[in-house]
Every structure is written in C-alpha cells, then in structure tokens.
Amino acid sequence: MAMPSYSSLSSHISITTTHTRPHPIFPCYYDTQSIPRFFISSDTGSSASKQRNIYLRLGSRKIIAGVGEGATSLSSHSDKMKTDSFPDPKLAKRDFPPGFWKDDIIDSIMSSNKVAAADEERVETLISEIKSMFRGMGDGETTPSAYDTAWVAKIPALDGSDHPHFPQTLQWILLNQLKDGSWGEEHHFLTYDRLLATLACIITLTVWRTGKTQVQKGIEFFKKHAGMMEDEADHRQPSGFEFVFPAMINEAKSLCLDLPYELPFIKQIIKKREAKLKRIPTDLLYTVPTIFLYYLEGLQEIVEWHKIIKLQSKDGSFLSSPASTAAVFMSTGNTKCLEFLNFVLMKFGNHAPCHYPIDLLERLWAVDTVQRLGIDRYFKEEIKEALDYIYSHWGERGIGWARENPVADIGVTAMGLRILRLNGYNVSSDVLRTFRDENGEFFSFMGQTERGVIDMLNLNRCSHVAFPGETVMEEAKHCTERYLWNALEDVDALDKWGLKKNIRGEVEYALKYPWLRSLPRLEARSYIENYGPNDAWLGKTMYIMPYINNGKYLELAKLDFNNVQSIHQKELRELRRWWKSSGFAELNFTRDRVAEIFFSIASSMFEPELATCRAVYTKSTICTVILDDLYDAHGSVEDIKLFNEAVKRWDLFLLDRMPEHIKICFLGLYNLVNEIAEEGRKRQGRDVLGYIRNLWEIQLETFMKEAEWSEAKYVPSFHEYIETASVSIAGATLVLFGVLFTGEVLTDHILSQIDYRSKFAYLMGLTGRLINDTKTYQAERGEGEVASAIQCYMKDHPEFSEEEALKQIYTLMENALADLKEEFLKAKDVPDKCKRLVFDYARSMQLFYQQGDGFTLAPNMEIKQHVKKILFEPVP
C-alpha cells in the first residue's frame, strides 16, 4: 500500500490542537488581573538548621511555600540539596550520558582561549569603510588585465598613421612587465594565465616594433615555462584558452617570434582547436548570444563579422570583453565597439580589465560575502540598495555578470535567485531552465558544456530554497550533489572560474550541512575559516575583485564573532548558575544540556540585543526537557496529574502533596513563568501571564497524554499520534515564549500567524517530531515506549516493514520541510526576527538529529564540537 502524500495527510491532521480552552493569544483566556503575583525570597535560617523555608510574597503577606527537610531553595546561596535525600522508589532513573559542559570545563576552555576585547573604534571604522565600498559600487572594480590591454593596444590609429590608437595602453605594457619577464597578476601564478598574457604582450610590442628588451625577456619566460602547461590541470585553463591561445601561437609564428612551437602540448592544443572550430554550430553562433562572443579574438578565421554584429551588447561590447570587442572593431570598424573601448579607457586610464562592466556579479558576491560572514546586520540599507539594483535587471532567462550581458551565467543567476528569494523578492526558479541541456544536465553558459565547482556550488545552495513543486530546483539539487561529491574525490578539486582559499572546505560544508540542517553562526564560523581575502578570479585571464575579496570583511567578521562569543559566554555562565540555584542540577532523572540548548538559540538569535530572548528560550527549554523526562520516567500517573493540576490552578499550596523531585520541578516552572511574565509585560505593554500559562498547560497536556499511552502500552493511530506529538515536541511553546523578546510589539494578528493555529507552527512541530522519532524510536522502544511515528505508522499499515515505514516517515518529513520553507519565505505579516526564531528552531532540530540523537548523546557526538566552536573557541 502506498503512503499518502504529505498534502493528503495534512488535510486530515488538524493544524490546531483540540483543547477546550481558547488558543494562547491575546486577549488571554485567564483573567490575569485576578492572578496574584508571587515573588521569591529565601530564608535559610542558621547554618546548622536542617529546615529551610521558601517564602513567596503576596503583597505584604509572607507565605511559606516550601517547608521541611529537603525543601528546595531558589537562592544560589542556600545549602546544596543531596539527591539521595528524596528518592522516589517508583521513579525510573534513566541512563543518560552525563553533561560534558560542566563549570570546570567551561572555565578551563575560556581561560585558555582568552582574546583581547574587540576594539569598538576599529569595528566602527571597518563598518564605515565597508559601507563606503558598497556605496562606491558602480560598474565594478577590478584589476588590470595585461591580456586585454594588449588587444586594445593593437588597434591602429584611425588616421592611418603607424601608431596605436590608444598609445597609453602600449605604454602600460612597457611599464608593467614583471621581474621574471612575464605579464599578469603579480601575486598569483597560473602557468596558463601567465603564458597567455605574456604571449599577447609580446605580440603587441612586436606589432608596434617597440620594447625589444621586454619582448626578449618575455620570450625567455615563455620558453622556460611553456612545458609546464602540460602538467597544470585542465580546469586551471582560462575561459576560451583552447581557442585564443592557439590563435595567438599562429600569429606569433607569422611574426617570426622565436617560440617553442614544436612542444607536444602546443601541437596538441592547436589540433584540439581545429577540431572544436569544426564542431561550432554556425546557426547557433549568429542567432543567439552564446559564450563564444566572449572570445571572438580566438575565432577570427571562422567569424562572419557582418552577422556577429547583430549580437552586440547595448553598450557596444561583446560580453563585456575588451579583447573580444577590440578584435571585432579591428575587423569591422564598428563605431559602437570604439565607443565602448573609449569608455573603458576613460574609466581605467591606461589599461583594460578582463570584464567591464561587472556590476551584477560584484553586488551579488559582496552581499553574499557579508551575509555568510555573519556581519550583514551592519549593512541592511546597503544590501537593500544592491538587491534592488539586481532585481531591476533580473530577466526571465537569468542574469550574467553585467547588466548589458546578453548571456546568462548560471553561477550569478543561481546566487541571485537564492539571495533575492531569501530577502523577499518575487523570483521564479524557471530561470534555471535556461541552463539545461537535452540530457537534463546543467551547464554554466549557453554554448558551453563545461561546469565549474563554484557555479555548481551556487546552484546547489540555490536548490535548497525551493518551494514545493519546483521540479527544476529538485533536479538541480540532485545534479549538483552528484557533481560536487565527484569533485571532492579529485585531489585537485579546484575551480574552473576562480582560485579560492578553500573551495574544498566550502563544498564539504554545503554537502554536510545544507541550509535546512545548518544554523547562521555555524555557517559564519565555517566561512570565516574558508574565506580568502586575496582570492583571485579566472575569466580569460586572472583578476582580483577588491569589493568581493577584501581583508576588511574578514577583519570585521573575526572581531564581531569573538565579541559576540564573549557576550554569549557571560550569558551561559549566568544560565549555569540559574540551573544550579533552581535545584535542577540535583535531579537524577534528567539531562544536563544547558550549553547545548543555549548553543541552539545562540547560533541563530545571536545578536547582543537579543540576550533576553536567548535566556528565556534556554530556561524554557531546560524546563521542558526536565518535565519531558519527568513524565517519561514518572513514578505514577497520579503524581503527574497532581503536577498538571497545580499548573492549572497555579496553586502553591499543592506543594505539600508533591514528592520532593516534583516540588523542585514545579517551583522552577513557577518562578520561570513569573519571571517571563514580568519581563514580557514590560516588553509588550500588556499582561502576558495568562498567555504563558496557557502555553504550558497545552504543553503539559500532551506530555500527560503520552504518559498515559506509555502506562497503558497503547499505540495510537498515526493521525492521533501526530496530533499530540507535533505539540509535545515543544517547538511552538518555546518559540512563542521567545518571540515576546525579539524587540517587536506583537499584535494578536502577528501571534495568530505563528501560534498553534498556524500552519507555520504545525509544520515546525511536525518536522521536529519526525526527525526526533527517526533517531530515537529504537532506544525509546528499548525503554518500554510503544508510541513513535514509525510504530504508529506501522500500526496503520501493517503491510510495511519497519525499514519501509522509516522511509515513508523521511519522505513525509522532507515534504513538510518544503512546505515550512515556503511558509518562512512567503510570510509577509510576521517580523523577520519572529520568523527566524520559528524557522531556525526547525533547522536546529534537523542539525541535532541529523546523524542520531544529538541532544541526549550530545557529549559523544559532533554537536560537542559545534558547541565548542561557537561558544568557546575564538577565531584566531
């Protein structure tokens, strides 16, 4: 029997929970004005006394809330309670791995990793300088290209005199030969690139019968290094190298330059070019813009110039290439070509770049850089201006590296689609269909079948922001994953279009932690380690883009990361103190995961101003974990019914009837709720106590329901299970506490978009529950638990094996995650920070349970290393 689709399943699983009380929104169900406010104080008496009283003040009355031997004090200065003073013989102690992040471990790591406090003045200076870079983005900043400058310098004077039309470019060549006799990017060396640029400059100087010394030095360099081309990897070849290099070799031969024409590699590449020229479809060459326009100087013997002019860009160039445009001008005299070249020289003075303009690529990569480095919050206005510019040039077939570029680039288009969609722009994934061949494979440019690692990485990252039903995005995901895994198997997994510091590290991270299974601070830490401020780019020649690769970005990212980390460390210490002072450290049936819980929220809502949000979320999660463990390991249904009743009545006088461990739990919850309510009232401008209590009652009812199932060994239907378990996972409860402290005043309408009534909250809970169950059901079954998504699904479908049921659950989860993405990206009425909190809770669940039970077993799993890197280990 086939599994029902996610859409059909969600149609009969209620989006809301079925409770008798209204849903937890304002106005509250409870008459909050009639509920007394209790404030904690403690009176431990003499140090010798065994009796400790906890007092809660109601107005001027002092009520004894806990009396007797072993009663709990919330004061951090009270006597430490011994666990063995109140064992419940019926309470099942669970064998959890002990917490790793104890105070001594934390103190030891922090003391050994001390870094100097961030220089606030330096931070402000860097922010100002980077803002200036964004504001200065015009047509694109890039370094000189000796190769393109040589082609422009070949253009003869229009008056027929024996001089170059652009003499300043010839002078630039004479003055910019490197010490080793070559021309090219001084601080990066690729044999192909250096020889190509050097050959172009030698030819131009020879044409103009000048610079004999430079020509001779260039020839010597060429002879010395030409044999090295055979050993350099093919994907280090500049774009169009197989066309332009052999063409220049032929020209050099006609000029009688003394070069090693008989080298096997040179003979081989000449033959390769001849074969490729025969395969170029002429109908394609002249009818639609293709990447061939980028290197027309290497195709001169086959080009019909009067036809190719029809594909000229509006700015007069051919794919923004000065060299290609110069070649067309020398063959046609086209005035628009000359206008473009004049414009380039007006901009750069005495040289030409590899591309001009390159405005779209520069803006997109700059935005991507600050976002991935985790410093984008400083540049919101600049990012919006850049993205508005990109969007204004967005086309139904994608975009290229420049606004007038008629050939779309898959790397730029994929990055644009992803970033625009993540920032709320309406863009269709249909643009990706432009880049598919007849076999369904994706290519980089029209007319070229080769692909680069960076292009495929950008396409892969783009595929993870797909909406349900976007088949082209799903196909892109599968295609790029296959390509990237294969690239990693190559020892030289380098890129076709760029020389990045650690492209292998970027690919490994993207494949291991895709967007739905990553968190912002994790990605920032990874990219800080992989980002190269001196990375080079490879077009027809090598070039640098200083507004994309710049040490200022990295310096700010490091200062900011370490500063935020130091703030988080102080917060974690306070939370550890609260954990102990609340008596939770003495409970023997629960898990000490304070650091892991704090990591999950600090990796998402990391900004310093969200400290209260982090504290509330962490404390609430700790209480949820404790109560979940209490209900799972309950001594009796009666005890937890009493706990539920106390929460409903909010009645401290029920404490005397509670076992000591339950008393600790209730007092901890009671004081936390009051703390949150008081702070929430200040932030929201209205009473939120009833709202918070209502959330806890809903949460505890689901815990109670699951405890009853366990007690009765009852396996519910899948529908019944999901209705309860998608709430018991506690995602909605936790984020609904947290959203009160995101800096927004929340209306009833906003809350209705993210509370239990919303599809957003339902999908968050559903995906969290399903990933949790897939990784914990076997261990919990061994402890006597009978209800999980897998077991309940098998009850409904006895024809399925456990393995088959597990696959169906994974399919359901992936479909639900796709719907969750759509809710996140399309929600317009919810403030961004509120959306982030909801969505990143779901992402954190996927991260923690990616390989196993990363929460319970966190001390023994990779989560431990994540916690260390984000919370304790500064960036050097």
Swiss-Prot record:
Gene3D superfamilies: 1.50.10.160, Farnesyl Diphosphate Synthase, Terpene synthase, N-terminal domain. Mg(2+) 2 binds at D628, D632. Belongs to the terpene synthase family. Tpsd subfamily. It is found in: Plastid, Chloroplast. This is Monofunctional isopimaradiene synthase, chloroplastic. Binds 3 Mg(2+) ions per subunit. It catalyses: (+)-copalyl diphosphate = isopimara-7,15-diene + diphosphate. Mg(2+) 3 binds at N772, T776, E780. Pathway: Terpene metabolism; oleoresin biosynthesis. Residues 1-64 form a transit peptide. Its EC number is 4.2.3.44. SUPFAM superfamilies: Terpenoid cyclases/Protein prenyltransferases, Terpenoid synthases. Coiled coil: none annotated. Its main location: plastid. One of its GO terms (biological process) is defense response. The Asp-Asp-Xaa-Xaa-Asp/Glu (DDXXD/E) motif is important for the catalytic activity in the class I active site, presumably through binding to Mg(2+). Its cofactor is Mg(2+). GO terms for cellular component: chloroplast. It comes from Pinus banksiana (Jack pine). One of its GO terms (molecular function) is magnesium ion binding. A motif (DDXXD motif) lies at residues 628-632. Keywords: Chloroplast, Lyase, Magnesium, Metal-binding, Plant defense, Plastid, Transit peptide. Involved in defensive oleoresin formation in conifers in response to insect attack or other injury. Involved in diterpene (C20) olefins biosynthesis. Monofunctional enzyme lacking the DXDD motif in the class II active site relevant for the cyclization of geranylgeranyl diphosphate (GGPP). Requires (+)-copalyl diphosphate ((+)-CPP) as substrate, but no activity with GGPP or ent-CPP. Isopimaradiene is the major products of the enzyme followed by sandaracopimaradiene. Mg(2+) 1 binds at D628, D632.
